[in-house]
């Protein structure tokens, strides 16, 4: 299978085909270590001197999306609001692009707004228009056709009337997405993943799932519903998640969603809503407060209902149907926890979640966690906990030298067959400098023969990380590297493809 996490710009600017960066004006310095340039106007600029751009929060489209742009235009046809996309906007001659925005008029009457695709030499290579005249939020849609190829184009919004405009959710999507889906995946990148023939997809993390601090734990409910109502989230890898890429399918693989076990990453350093002092801003932060655990557990159960519930008879099944998927996903697995330190705080909350899922949904296999290494305290205590509770499967992670994989062919030969099954959820061979080369790929291939031989114990495997965008990597090696116009599978990719 494959493991997808939004690291290395894997989602926004990557697999998610949206071409506009900071479309929701929700970037904030806290996304990026208090970088003051990473703010609500990041990636946006004003061309011309007769207009100003500011950010407002009064009467937004939705409380989950509180910031929007105020474009105050004092000279018609002479100023533009520009967006440079993610390292530029790549366009293909003759292809169509879906444009949309939410807009309203704050002062004046508004009017026609030109929407241009502009190459880096300032040549207009695509144009359409929308009308922004309403005093209330209203979505406008149009289609642009690129008249030439471009590697680093920009989007230009040019009001034709003097007015003060409120704008939000400014979006540009290629019509040629993977399988032609609206709000879909970048076609070439998604096809490269599909060519691995994954039997399952683990998502959304990884570290993203349990987050940097309790308030950064991945809230799956914020990733579904209309795009303008989704709740953006700070990415602990140092950037922003629009969460346009939500909980749905596109490759026919089994879903393996991962939820936090009521605790954030043990390396957290961001204060939670209940933190009382600097000490309680660190580590697992005491876990989700016990008075909030009932609701947290209900959120876990609601995810299963969203995936499997009857679209006519259940609350969350109905929401899935409203999203365009009345047929259940037939969810079989759910991960609880990720590489966690097995502390009393973790154990108490994991037990509560595990017992609730087992009682309500015995048909769903809960996957526990045994820490980030193939040995050590968390590995041993995690296995002891799984054995005590009867957890049906555990998630093992390890990043090791090629030599370890070569000399540990018997690693799973001696596992107790009466205990939990294993999901090797994250692994890779690491060399100094972190290349993905023939040596690492051969070591991984050799090790997978031993894993396959022990298929009665190790039921699932996935390499990590999966994707990395040039110039935006937080981790190496990765399986697939890409930029706006190219996708470059590594040698290790072909190892995974052979086993797929």
Predicted features by range, described:
Residues 247, 351-365, 383-500:
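Catalytic-core region of carbohydrate-active enzymes that cleave or remodel glycosidic bonds
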Residues 1-242, 273-283, 290-291, 361, ...:
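Extracellular and organelle-lumenal recognition/adhesion modules and their flexible linkers in secreted
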Residues 2, 25, 101, 197, ...:
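Conserved, mostly hydrophobic/aromatic
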Residues 8-9, 206-210, 261-265, 338-342, ...:
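Solvent-exposed loop/turn segments at secondary-structure junctions
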Residues 1, 195, 200-202, 254-256, ...:
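Structural preference for beta-strand elements that scaffold enzyme active sites
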Residues 87, 171-183, 229-244, 261, ...:
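The substrate-binding groove and active-site-proximal loops of carbohydrate-active enzymes
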Residues 108, 133, 264-265, 311-315, ...:
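Acidic-and-aromatic substrate-binding clefts and catalytic sites of carbohydrate-active enzymes
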Residues 144-156, 162, 175-199, 203, ...:
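An active-site-proximal structural segment forming one wall of the substrate-binding cleft
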């Amino acid at each position: 299978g494959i493991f997808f996490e939004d690291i290395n710009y894997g989602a926004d600017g990557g697999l998610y085909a949206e071409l506009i960066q900071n479309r929701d004006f929700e970037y904030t310095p806290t996304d990026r270590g208090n970088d003051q340039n990473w703010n609500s106007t990041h990636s946006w600029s004003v061309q011309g001197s007769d207009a100003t751009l500011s950010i407002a929060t009064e009467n937004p489209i939705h409380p989950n999306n509180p910031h929007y742009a105020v474009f105050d235009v004092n000279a018609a046809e002479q100023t533009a609001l520009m967006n440079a996309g993610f390292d530029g906007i790549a366009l293909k001659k003759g292809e169509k692009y879906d444009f949309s925005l939410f807009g309203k008029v704050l002062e004046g009457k508004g009017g026609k707004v030109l929407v241009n695709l502009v190459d880096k030499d300032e040549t207009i290579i695509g144009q359409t228009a929308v009308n922004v005249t309403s005093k209330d939020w209203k979505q406008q849609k149009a289609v642009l056709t690129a008249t030439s190829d471009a590697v680093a184009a920009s989007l230009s919004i040019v009001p034709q009337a003097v007015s003060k405009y409120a704008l939000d959710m400014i979006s540009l999507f290629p019509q040629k997405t993977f399988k032609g889906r609206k709000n879909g995946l970048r076609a070439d990148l998604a096809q490269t993943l599909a060519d691995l023939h994954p039997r399952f997809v683990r998502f959304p993390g990884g570290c993203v799932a349990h987050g940097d601090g309790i308030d950064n734990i991945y809230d799956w409910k914020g990733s579904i519903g209309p795009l303008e109502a989704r709740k953006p989230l700070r990415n602990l890898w140092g950037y922003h998640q629009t969460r346009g890429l939500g909980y749905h399918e596109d490759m026919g693989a089994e879903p393996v969603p991962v939820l936090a076990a009521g605790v954030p990453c043990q390396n957290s350093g961001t204060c939670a809503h209940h933190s009382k002092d600097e000490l309680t801003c660190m580590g697992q932060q005491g876990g989700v407060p016990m008075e909030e655990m009932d609701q947290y557990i209900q959120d876990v159960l609601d995810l299963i209902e969203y995936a499997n519930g009857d679209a006519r008879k259940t609350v969350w099944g109905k929401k899935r149907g409203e999203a365009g998927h009345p047929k259940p996903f037939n969810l079989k697995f759910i991960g609880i926890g990720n590489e966690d330190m097995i502390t009393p705080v973790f154990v108490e909350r994991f037990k509560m979640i595990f017992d609730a899922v087992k009682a309500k949904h015995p048909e769903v296999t809960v996957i526990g966690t045994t820490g980030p290494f193939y040995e050590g305290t968390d590995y041993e205590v995690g296995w002891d906990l799984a054995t005590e509770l009867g957890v049906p499967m555990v998630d093992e992670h390890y990043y090791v030298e090629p030599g370890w994989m070569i000399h540990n062919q018997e690693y799973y030969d001696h596992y107790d067959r009466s205990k939990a099954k294993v999901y090797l959820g994250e692994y890779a061979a690491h060399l100094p400098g972190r290349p993905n080369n023939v040596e690492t790929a051969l070591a991984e291939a050799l090790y997978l023969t031993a894993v396959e031989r022990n298929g009665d114990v190790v039921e699932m495997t996935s390499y990590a990380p999966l994707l990395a965008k040039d110039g935006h990597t937080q981790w190496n090696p990765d399986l697939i590297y890409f930029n706006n116009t190219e996708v470059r599978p590594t040698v290790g990719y072909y190892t995974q493809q052979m086993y797929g």
